[in-house]
Amino acid sequence: MGGISIWQLLIIALIIVLLFGTKKLRSLGGDLGSAVKGFKKAIGDEELTVKKDNTEADADFEQKTLSKEEQQSEDPVQKSQKDKEQV
């Protein structure tokens, strides 16, 4: 009723082909396709860069963990002396 039917779309397509010709429409379609392909490639490259950045570590050092025995065996006096030595 208020929408565009298939026949109206076919008539519009026929008018466009008559106005521009098939060669110009082919080249226009090829240009549009290459633009979309380039856009997808750029988006894919950006995603790879983001994934690569996320997997790299911020710094090159190893995380050290103390076992429970080592943590309990340290004396509070020794801890304060170590803290003073580090400053």
Swiss-Prot record:
The keyword Oxidoreductase does not apply. GO terms for biological process: protein transport by the Tat complex. The chain crosses the membrane at residues 1-21. One of its GO terms (cellular component) is TAT protein transport complex. Belongs to the TatA/E family. The Tat system comprises two distinct complexes: a TatABC complex, containing multiple copies of TatA, TatB and TatC subunits, and a separate TatA complex, containing only TatA subunits. Substrates initially bind to the TatABC complex, which probably triggers association of the separate TatA complex to form the active translocon. This is Sec-independent protein translocase protein TatA. It comes from Photobacterium profundum (strain SS9). The gene is tatA.
